[in-house]
C-alpha cells in the first residue's frame, strides 16, 4: 500500500499494483506528482528547488532494504512524504 502525506495528514492511499498518478497541489503553490507503475512508486515531479525527492528514484518491495530512506520518499521543502507499507 502506498500512503502519501502532506505534513502529518494522510493525503491519499493507493494500491501499489494499480497504475496511477497522484497529484498534490497545495495552496502555497507547491506541487508534487507521485507515480505508481507496475509495482513501483516514485516522485515524478516536484516544484521544490533541490529535486532530492525526484532523485531518490523508484521504490519497490524488493529494494526498500537497500534504499537510504528505506520505505520512504521525502520532499522536505514541500512537506510531502510517500510511504510504502503493508496492506
Label every model-predicted segment.
Residues 5-16:
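Transition segment at domain starts
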Residues 32, 36-50, 78:
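Glycine- and acidic-residue-biased ligand/ion/polar-headgroup-sensing regions
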Residues 2-6, 25:
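A short beta-strand micro-motif
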Residues 13, 31-33, 72:
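Short, surface-exposed charged micro-motifs
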Residues 24, 42-44, 82:
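Short hydrophobic/aromatic-rich beta-strand segments that constitute the beta-sheet cores
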Residues 48-72:
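An anionic, turn-rich surface loop/hairpin at beta-sheet edges
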Residues 16-23, 71:
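Short, hydrophobic/aromatic-rich segments at coil-to-beta transitions
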Residues 66-87:
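C-terminal partner/receptor-binding element of secreted or periplasmic proteins
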Amino acid at each position: 500500500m502506498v500512503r502519501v502525506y502532506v505534513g502529518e495528514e494522510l493525503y491519499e492511499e493507493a494500491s501499489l499494483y494499480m497504475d496511477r498518478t497522484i497529484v498534490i497541489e497545495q495552496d502555497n503553490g507547491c506541487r508534487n506528482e507521485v507515480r505508481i507503475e507496475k509495482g513501483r512508486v516514485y516522485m515524478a515531479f516536484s516544484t521544490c528547488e533541490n529535486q532530492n525527492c525526484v532523485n531518490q528514484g523508484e521504490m519497490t518491495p524488493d529494494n526498500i532494504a537497500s534504499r537510504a530512506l528505506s520505505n520512504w520518499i521525502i520532499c522536505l521543502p514541500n512537506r510531502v512524504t510517500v510511504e510504502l507499507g503493508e496492506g
